[in-house]
A protein has these predicted regions:
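Flexible gly/pro/ser-rich segments immediately N-terminal to CXXCH heme-c attachment motifs
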Residues: 42-52, 72-92, 120, 176
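Acidic-enriched, low-complexity/disordered segments with a strong bias for Aspartate over Glutamate
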Residues: 42-45, 49, 63, 70-71, ...
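The canonical Cys-X-X-Cys-His
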Residues: 54-63, 90-100
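C-type cytochrome heme-c attachment and multiheme electron-transfer modules
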Residues: 54, 91, 101, 106-200
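Inter-heme linker and motif-flanking segments adjacent to c-type heme-binding CXXCH motifs
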Residues: 64-84, 99-108
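Post-cleavage N-terminal segment of exported redox proteins
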Residues: 1-42, 52-58, 62-67, 185-200
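A generic structural signal for ordered alpha-helices
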Residues: 34-37, 71-74, 165
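Generic alpha-helical propensity signal that fires on short helical segments
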Residues: 19, 24, 68-69, 74-77, ...
Length: 200
């Protein structure tokens, strides 16, 4: 029996339509991607709210001069980075900064108190530039994503930001605008979702 051309045409048309439908993303897929992207951006913004706060930024200077206070004024006594990020021999950071806050003098303290390496200078950078420097192994101490998460969520010096002690006048130092637990979650989620830096 000879098959009429019209039937062949209809059969091919139906098959083509089915193939197209099978390979067309569903609306729900778009919604899921958009939701995931928005969630990642929220985590990024929350993380950056902390990294650009004085508690972090004061120890990530671009001029090798540690900063102090909410106004980020230069460290008293003419302190500077020194060759190993710990000041100079006669004025080493741990001369005053011990492993914990001094509630009598108001001098802050945490384990291995020091300036961040010069390669991690964030002062004056945009959020995007900070993120790029954070992820670049040439500037982040050759840390992998896993090591960065550990550093940012477990290192006592980083977490000091939420237990900064008091000023010499007895006033409490300002805390970052995000809670410690929310910051940790934001960091973990951002890296888990690929550490994507928003384009704007």
């Amino acid at each position: 029996m000879k098959v009429k051309p019209i039937y062949i045409f209809l059969t091919l048309s139906v098959m083509g339509l089915l193939f197209t439908l099978a390979n067309t993303p569903k609306i729900s897929a778009y919604e899921l991607l958009e939701e995931q992207s928005q969630s990642s951006n929220d985590d990024y913004d929350m993380m950056m709210d902390v990294l650009t706060h004085q508690r972090c930024m004061n120890c990530h200077p671009s001029d090798n001069i540690p900063k102090q206070g909410d106004d980020s004024h230069p460290h008293y006594f003419g302190m500077a980075r020194g060759k190993d990020d710990h000041g100079f021999e006669a004025t080493n950071c741990n001369t005053c900064h011990q492993s914990e806050n001094n509630l009598n003098s108001g001098v802050p303290g945490a384990p291995h108190w020091a300036l961040a390496p010069a390669s991690m200078a964030w002062e004056g950078l945009t959020r995007q530039e900070i993120a790029e420097r954070l992820l670049d192994k040439n500037t982040n101490g050759n840390r992998s994503h896993e090591e960065l998460v550990e550093h940012m969520t477990e290192d006592d010096l980083v977490l000091w930001a939420w237990e900064p002690g008091i000023h010499a006048n007895g006033e409490q130092r300002t805390l970052p605008p995000v809670s410690k637990e929310d910051f940790k979650k934001a960091v973990e989620n951002w890296f888990a979702n690929g550490a994507v830096i928003p384009s704007k």
